Amino acid sequence: LDKTREVIRRKCPEYLNCFDRVMKQTSGYMFNMFIVRKDLLDSYCTWLFDVLFELENKVDLTGLSEFQKRCFGRISELLFNVWLEYQLERNVVQVEQIKKFRWGYMEPIRSRKKIQAFLFAKFCGKRYRCSF
């Protein structure tokens, strides 16, 4: 995430305050799923992939597990929130326009393992090795 911040600072500094705010949040819009007008989608994709392609050149994936190599997908989930925050700040999108759909997770979740892995990651610095 430090490298992501650096890319944003260099390529699109107007987004930096939004990035910093989003990184302090404990919630957000995840899973890279949304319904949006084409012009906003084009704007988002242009910005997102410009940042991600630059970031890809700065991150060495050597020695990482297949799970860890999916970092760009996870970073893109956070970046959607940065982009959205910026659009809200500029009044391109209004809060009232954001609709949330409730959905259920269809696969079983191993809650005990998930909680245990989260605590180990949070307090012991042990990285996740798989999804739950």
Regions found by a protein language model. Give the residues of each.
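ER/Golgi luminal nucleotide-sugar-dependent glycosyltransferases, focusing on the catalytic module
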Residues: L1-F132
